[in-house]
Amino acid sequence: LEICREADLLVLEDNPYGLLGFDDEPYRALRADEHDRVVYLGSFSKTFAPGMRVGWVLAPHAVREKLVLAQESSTLCPPTFSQQMVSAYLEGYDWLGQVKQFREMYRERRDAMLGALTDMMPAGTSWTVPTGGFYVWLRLPDGMDAGAMLPRAVTARVAYVPGTAFYADGFGSQCIRLSYCFPTPERIREGVRRLASVIEQELELREVFGTSTRALPPSYDAPGPDLT
C-alpha cells in the first residue's frame, strides 16, 4: 500500500474467497486500512450459491461513479430477482453461521485432498497447502507438461486446469490447479488416485522417449473412454 501511495496508484482487491479461510479469523482486507486507494470486490457466488452471480464493489466515490457508468453500459438490466434473493437471505438468515459451516466443509475436503496427494503422488510432485478457498496448486515432476497430459487425464475421467491458464506469458506449463470444492472426500481421493496413475504413466513414457510429453507425436493419445 505504501508503494502504491507513493506512485499514486489504485489497488484492486478482488477477494471472493476472503470469508472462506480456515483460520479462526478472516484475513484483514487491504481496504480496511486504505479507504481512498483500494477498490474492493466481493461475491456471493462463493458464500451463498454458485449460480447466484451477484457481487459488490466498495470504492472511493470518484471511482464508484465511473463504475456505475460502466455497469450501465455493459449490463443494461441486471436481474433484480437474484439481488432481492440475496437481500432477503442477508436479512432473514444467519449467513455468518452458514459461512462457518462452509469453512468446515471445505476444510474437510482440503484435508482429504492433501492426504490423498501425500499417499499417492509419485516422487518429484509438490503442492501447496491452502489456508482457504477451493484449490490446491500442484507442480508436476521436472520435464512434464500439464497441457499435454490433460487429454490423457480426461480419458482417465479426471480433469484439472493447466497452470498456463493463469499466466499471460506461457509460464506454468508444469503446474495444475486442482479443485476440492464440489466432490465429496471419497470422490476426491478417487480423483487423486486416477491423476496419480496418469502422472506415473507419463513418467514411464518420458523414460522411454527420453523427452517431455510435449514432444511426443501429435497422433499419440490413449483410447477414448467407454461411456456406455
Model regions: which residues?
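PLP-dependent enzyme catalytic core of the Aspartate aminotransferase-like
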Residues: T155, A168-T228
